């Protein structure tokens, strides 16, 4: 029966420990985004809608060109609901406070406190209550400061949309500005530059419409949207050129579109809609500290009954033995672990906040230090998410100012909405040359862009009798209307040989990840009247302008620093492999063999896990491909970070041990992340890694000290209990000693850390902790036994009448040795000489040691059942402590050479 009870107790503790020790639930957190794949039915629906003609669209969504009337809207709202994404509600403060309290250590101490109170040991009960209260309140305060309850999904889209509705019984239609939650399937929406897409839409009218959907697909350049699909065989809904998806935005142009999905039925809604349905799994930090904590709790649960049995049997007073065993249990419980962990992590968060980094989840600090693989999106994360003019060359690939200035005139004089490429061209010419071009050349006319021609032209003049037509557009479309080429300053025919040369140059640019636009000209006699499309013929190909989304300035040094810190960087992007490989080259990463999304789809988990370990660049990935790769790398035993800024990154951010987002990220990505970088510099990543390793090292100091001290103390108690006719220390003494020791450890979060402890990723290792206990615990027991001998034979405290002297002597030795151990095992070096603790820790340990020595001489000595120690005791005390420190240093040297030092 006892065996079953113990098994059930361990099961309960193990079930609750991973999340409740450091991470509170259920605070509002987009990390709970469901990882379930997008349903096939939704993908098929999108593809069907994309292929429909206009009449089929009206029938499918029970709509009509005049818009919906009030009755139809009410019916559809009843059928489909409001256009809202489900969001998780923040928990009230008292639920958060309760979750801060209910970790296994606090629950265990509460039970011990109740037992102490029921036995009228009020002091012990008060001390335990103080420990539990401090730990709980500190956790609550620190996490309340660190966690911001934000409704990311509601902030994801714009507040209103322009909708065509029937406004009266006569059937009169009017464009209305309505809140987006009132949109229903079948509504007709007007789009213009700058608008966020308020629902999933099918385009029915479009003029020069470009939509930025990098947040969904990772593609850095805006994509064209048209009324009739150019690719009827398209199988990826996100690449359908007749569909727009919620959460993306219009870059340029205008359109009318019909709503075909709203709220949780949208593509974005499927990614985000299961926020409250699934609980995120414990990350590496939670799993590690769970295993370590269970080791310490098991040790306490095993040793306490042994102490009870030995004392009860040898002393014959089972009640006194029970009280003593209870005090031992309190002493063996690492009650300060939650507070030390939280305060250490919180200090790291405060230090990072000075670097303009928001730490939303405290355990992310340690995961930063443990991370050995960083997977990162490309667009907007490593890159500037801004199109710049990278090259301007003639047809042979040589840099050409003529081509640049010609392209500038085209972009400058067009009257349509300028897209990102035009903006990049205009910014590519300095102010003075641009002013000179504008003064020399006057606009005559233009031929606007359309998607059939995929080019646009302006006509300018420098002399009264000559006009120049400048045409800019997609390479193939320009070649279709060109007959000549400007080559080495001469005008030559565009023959097959020249065409092969052109292809070689442009293919090279494409392989470099550049988007190539061709520029051509034509000289015409001056004339009156408008120019037409037919004038775009017999053009002279001048050269090319090529564009790129460049890396941030800090990307290359940041990735180099991460690599030097033992972290492997992998790129996971939805963009093309050519563009991604170019960025990898720019930032100093060897892309190697690129793996694309279709390959990921074809592999099973074992094959993909093996491939993921040796692959640096993954391209053309869907959101769930990224999540799958991150999950499989975690399965292989890695601590994985993911850095991204788009909707398509949210599942991977949630799946990673540490999610990192950057400035300018969409709200859903910021909410899914644990860490948010508020500045463009990525160098703070290195600082975060170092801070994570520093906090881990300081947490490990407390755990090592607690584990080794507890092991040694229990061994000493067992030896003393077996041979002494009285208790080696009263329960009250154990509680006071434990309280003073805990006070000395409050300064651990402020301690220094040796350089070698932050060079490589640091992880929890329960096996190493167990070995550490066995090596260092008995050292203190050796000197405890020497103290027993000293008090018994030298000071003759060997009868029950003299037990107070015996207990006072061991109280001082035990407290001082336990307090000094922090300086011995906080470093593998020689303490105080090669490595010195931070001043707060030195001051706290000195203070506790002074208090411990003074208590037997203080007015409280009688109440505490201590007595003044003879002066001859103190030389022995110094010798014992010196011997203890010397032997510990010797064992430490052997241990670090044999097993290493965390």
Question: Whereabouts are the PLM-identified features?
Answer:
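Non-lumenal N-terminal regulatory segments of integral membrane proteins
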Residues: 1-184, 189-197, 202-210, 214-221, ...
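Soluble-to-membrane junctions at the N-terminal ends of transmembrane alpha-helices
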Residues: 82-114, 147, 234-243, 274-302, ...
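Alpha-helical transmembrane segments of multi-pass membrane proteins
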Residues: 99-118, 132, 136, 158-159, ...
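Helix-interface capping motifs at the ends of transmembrane segments in multi-pass membrane proteins
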Residues: 107-127, 167-170, 295-333, 346-356, ...
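Hydrophobic alpha-helical transmembrane segments
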Residues: 119, 127-158, 165, 281-376, ...
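Basic, amphipathic juxtamembrane/active-site segments
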Residues: 210, 217, 227-231, 384-404, ...
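Cytosolic catalytic regions of ATP/NTP-dependent phosphoryl-transfer enzymes
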Residues: 243-251, 367-541, 547, 560-561, ...
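Membrane-embedded transport module
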Residues: 307, 338, 345-347, 591-642, ...
């Amino acid at each position: 029966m006892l065996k079953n009870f113990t098994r059930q107790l361990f099961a309960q503790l193990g079930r609750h420990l991973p999340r409740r020790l450091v991470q509170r639930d259920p605070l509002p957190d987009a990390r709970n985004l469901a990882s379930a794949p997008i349903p096939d039915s939704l993908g098929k629906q999108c593809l069907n809608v994309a292929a429909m003609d206009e009449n089929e669209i009206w029938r499918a969504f029970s709509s009509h060109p005049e818009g919906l009337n009030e009755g139809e809207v009410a019916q559809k709202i009843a059928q489909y609901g409001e256009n809202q994404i489900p969001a998780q509600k923040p928990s009230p403060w008292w639920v958060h406070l309760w979750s801060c309290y209910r970790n296994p250590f606090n629950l265990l101490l509460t039970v011990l406190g109740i037992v102490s109170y029921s036995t009228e040991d009020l002091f012990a009960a008060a001390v335990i209550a103080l420990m539990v209260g401090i730990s709980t309140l500190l956790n609550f305060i620190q996490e309340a400061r660190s966690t911001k309850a934000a409704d990311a999904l509601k902030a994801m889209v714009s507040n209103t949309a322009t909708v065509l509705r029937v406004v009266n019984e006569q059937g009169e239609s009017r464009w209305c500005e309505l809140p987006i939650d009132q949109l229903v399937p079948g509504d007709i929406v007007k789009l213009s530059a700058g608008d966020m897409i308020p629902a999933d839409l099918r385009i029915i009218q479009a003029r020069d419409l470009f939509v930025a959907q990098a947040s969904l697909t990772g593609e850095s350049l805006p994509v064209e949207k048209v009324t009739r699909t150019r690719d009827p065989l398209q199988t990826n809904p996100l690449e359908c050129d007749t569909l727009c998806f919620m959460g993306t935005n219009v870059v340029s142009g205008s359109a009318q579109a019909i709503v075909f999905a709203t709220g949780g039925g949208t593509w974005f809604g499927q990614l985000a809609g299961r926020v409250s349905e699934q609980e995120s799994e414990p990350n590496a930090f939670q799993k590690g500290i769970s295993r370590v904590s269970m080791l310490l709790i098991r040790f306490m649960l095993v040793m306490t009954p042994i102490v009870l049995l030995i004392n009860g049997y040898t002393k014959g007073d089972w009640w006194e033995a029970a009280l003593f065993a209870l005090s031992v249990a309190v002493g063996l419980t690492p009650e300060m672990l939650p507070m030390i962990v939280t305060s250490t992590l919180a200090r790291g968060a405060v230090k990072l906040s000075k670097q303009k980094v928001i730490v939303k989840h405290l355990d992310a600090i340690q995961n930063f230090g443990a991370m050995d693989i960083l997977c990162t999106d490309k667009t907007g994360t490593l890159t500037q998410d801004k199109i710049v003019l990278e090259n301007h060359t003639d047809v042979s690939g040589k840099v050409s100012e003529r081509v640049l200035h010609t392209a500038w005139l085209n972009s400058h004089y067009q009257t349509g909405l300028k897209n990102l490429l035009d903006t990049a061209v205009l910014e590519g010419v300095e102010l003075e040359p641009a002013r000179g071009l504008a003064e020399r050349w006057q606009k005559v006319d233009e031929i606007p862009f359309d998607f059939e021609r995929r080019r646009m032209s302006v006509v300018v003049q420098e002399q009264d009798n000559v006009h120049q037509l400048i045409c800019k557009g997609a390479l193939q479309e320009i070649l279709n209307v060109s007959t000549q080429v400007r080559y080495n300053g001469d005008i030559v025919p565009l023959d097959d040989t020249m065409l092969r040369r052109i292809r070689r140059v442009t293919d090279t640019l494409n392989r470099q990840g550049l988007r190539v636009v061709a520029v051509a000209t034509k000289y015409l006699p001056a004339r009156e009247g408008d120019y037409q499309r037919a004038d775009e013929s017999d053009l002279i190909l001048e050269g090319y302008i090529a564009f790129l989304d460049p890396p941030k300035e800090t990307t290359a040094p940041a990735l180099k620093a991460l690599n030097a810190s033992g972290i492997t960087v992998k790129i996971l992007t939805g963009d093309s492999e050519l563009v991604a490989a170019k960025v990898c080259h720019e930032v100093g990463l060897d892309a190697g063999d690129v793996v694309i999304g279709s390959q990921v789809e074809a592999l099973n988990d074992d094959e993909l896990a093996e491939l993921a370990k040796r692959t640096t660049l993954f391209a053309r990935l869907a959101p769930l491909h990224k999540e799958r790769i991150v999950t499989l790398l975690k399965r292989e035993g890695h601590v994985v970070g993911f850095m991204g800024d788009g909707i398509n990154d949210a599942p991977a951010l949630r799946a990673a041990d540490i999610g990192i987002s950057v400035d300018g990220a969409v709200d859903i990505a910021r909410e899914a992340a644990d860490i948010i970088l508020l500045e463009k510099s990525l160098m703070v990543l290195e600082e975060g890694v170092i801070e994570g390793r520093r906090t881990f090292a300081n947490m490990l100091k407390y755990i090592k000290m607690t584990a080794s001290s507890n092991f040694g103390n229990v061994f000493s108690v067992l030896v003393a209990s077996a041979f002494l006719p009285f208790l080696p220390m009263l329960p009250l003494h154990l509680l006071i000693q434990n309280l003073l020791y805990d006070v000395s450890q409050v300064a651990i979060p402020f301690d220094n850390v040796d350089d070698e402890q932050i060079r490589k990723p640091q992880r929890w290792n329960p096996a190493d902790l167990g070995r550490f206990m066995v090596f260092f615990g008995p050292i203190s027991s050796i000197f405890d036994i020497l103290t027993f001998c000293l008090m018994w034979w030298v000071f003759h405290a060997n009868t029950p009448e003299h037990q107070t002297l015996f207990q006072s002597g061991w109280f001082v030795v035990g407290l001082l040795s336990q307090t000094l151990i922090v300086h011995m095992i906080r470093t593998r070096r020689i303490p105080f000489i090669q490595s010195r603790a931070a001043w707060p820790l030195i001051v706290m340990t000195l203070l506790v040691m002074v208090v411990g020595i003074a208590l037997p001489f203080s007015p409280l000595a009688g109440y505490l059942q201590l007595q003044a120690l003879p002066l001859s005791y103190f030389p022995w005390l110094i010798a014992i402590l010196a011997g203890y420190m010397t032997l510990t240093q010797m064992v430490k040297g052997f241990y670090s050479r044999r097993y290493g030092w965390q």
